[in-house]
Amino acid sequence: MAGNFWQSSHYLQWILDKQDLLKERQKDLKFLSEEEYWKLQIFFTNVIQALGEHLKLRQQVIATATVYFKRFYARYSLKSIDPVLMAPTCVFLASKVEEFGVVSNTRLIAAATSVLKTRFSYAFPKEFPYKMNHVLECEFYLLELMDCCLIVYHPYRPLLQYVQDMGQEDMLLPLAWRIVNDTYRTDLCLLYPPFMIALACLHVACVVQQKDARQWFAELSVDMEKILEIIRVILKLYEQWKNFDERKEMATILSKMPKPKPPPNSEGEQGPNGSQNSSYSQS
């Protein structure tokens, strides 16, 4: 693992400009409102979380998978590859990169099938439609997009250091950790360094637990304006999440989501089993 975040591909290539991110998203916003797009982000983060828990993966593996998912759709439209295929593909790749051990082909497909059927049947009435050959091809596109920049830095380690420095580990760490987990339902991991996200989550935890940490934060040499920007995003997430009824809303939103268009049936375009073209679009 790269020892220095500031020299890593995460910082040099994958801290994005907010305006560029919104510009790339315009293709999808022709079909979805901003609020619907945001709900899709929450939903597919929940799918990845459920998949990871079903496979008994560590939270860091799940977080890495979520970042991969967000990176892909930061550069490509939702219609380029079906997110239902991309979600388990990201879990599969992250489990290898984070040295958790390769999730076997059979376990991955069984997990995706089970999770969609038991946890998300309100959104996906049909069976999980993909096989392992689809996942492997999707993994190729994902690796190509990320230019094999696979090391992801997360807020967990800096958060632990900050809480220990503050001397309030038992009081603040569990809540701040949960807030970090929730930030993966936003664009924050694409826009800010992990240490800033950790500080913002710690700040929110201090406010909730009524811990006066103003002096501690005042002594940091960090751009507090950026920390406040992150806090505003976190508070907005909780405000909107409160009114989001996944079970009632997701089927309609998914029906509006742009879908991959099968390319013309010409020679050489048929997939390994003759059917995967419906999950990819090169447009």
From Swiss-Prot:
Q: From which domain of life does this come?
A: Eukaryota
User: Which SMART domains does UniProt cross-reference here?
Assistant: CYCLIN
Q: Name one GO biological process term.
A: positive regulation of transcription by RNA polymerase II
UniProt keywords (A-Z) are: Activator, Cyclin, Nucleus, Phosphoprotein, Repressor, Transcription, Transcription regulation
Residue ranges for the region (Disordered) are: 252-283
Residues annotated as carrying Phosphoserine in the record are 275
Q: Name one GO cellular component term.
A: CKM complex
Segments forming domain Cyclin N-terminal:
46-144
The protein's role, per its UniProt record? Component of the Mediator complex, a coactivator involved in regulated gene transcription of nearly all RNA polymerase II-dependent genes. Mediator functions as a bridge to convey information from gene-specific regulatory proteins to the basal RNA polymerase II transcription machinery. Mediator is recruited to promoters by direct interactions with regulatory proteins and serves as a scaffold for the assembly of a functional preinitiation complex with RNA polymerase II and the general transcription factors.
Query: What does the subunit comment say?
Result: Component of the Mediator complex, which is composed of MED1, MED4, MED6, MED7, MED8, MED9, MED10, MED11, MED12, MED13, MED13L, MED14, MED15, MED16, MED17, MED18, MED19, MED20, MED21, MED22, MED23, MED24, MED25, MED26, MED27, MED29, MED30, MED31, CCNC, CDK8 and CDC2L6/CDK11. The MED12, MED13, CCNC and CDK8 subunits form a distinct module termed the CDK8 module. Mediator containing the CDK8 module is less active than Mediator lacking this module in supporting transcriptional activation.
Protein's UniProt name? Cyclin-C
